């Protein structure tokens, strides 16, 4: 929802994920947006509002790219905070990450780096199978079934 709202506000087609990602890949520069995680739960309301306040009709293409980069960076920050919270609560050795967010190359790379740094095994579906969270549920179920024999 966060990605689509920002993308549409920038004039991108809906769903906006791949279009916003294309903008984000045009730069490494950005002005940070907040990330919000409380008790292991992510809220994108604040980051989305902050991003929406930056959007105006006179934005240059590079400003749009920087905002897109900031959006995905804030999502990555939130994901890392959430995972860190949960791995402190429970012993975790593996992470299954599937859904629309994991079809994004920036977030996928970020999760790979985070998991490697924190000695977590990362299981992800191929990007074309990560466009919808229903895929994530199916992937997780298949993984559990396989691990139980």
Summary of predicted features, one role per range:
Residues 1-62, 143, 147-149:
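A short helix-loop
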Residues 12, 92, 120:
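Short glycine/serine/threonine/alanine-rich loop segments
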Residues 39-45, 50-96:
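Adenine-nucleotide phosphate-binding core of ATP-dependent small-molecule kinases
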Residues 47, 107, 134-137:
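Residues at alpha-helix caps and immediate loop-helix transition turns in enzyme cores, especially N-
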Residues 51-52, 57, 106-120:
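Acidic-glycine-rich active-site phosphate/pyrophosphate-binding loop
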Residues 92-111:
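Glycine-rich phosphate-binding loops at beta-strand->alpha-helix junctions
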Residues 95, 112-137:
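Conserved phosphate-binding/catalytic loops in two-lobed NTP-binding clefts
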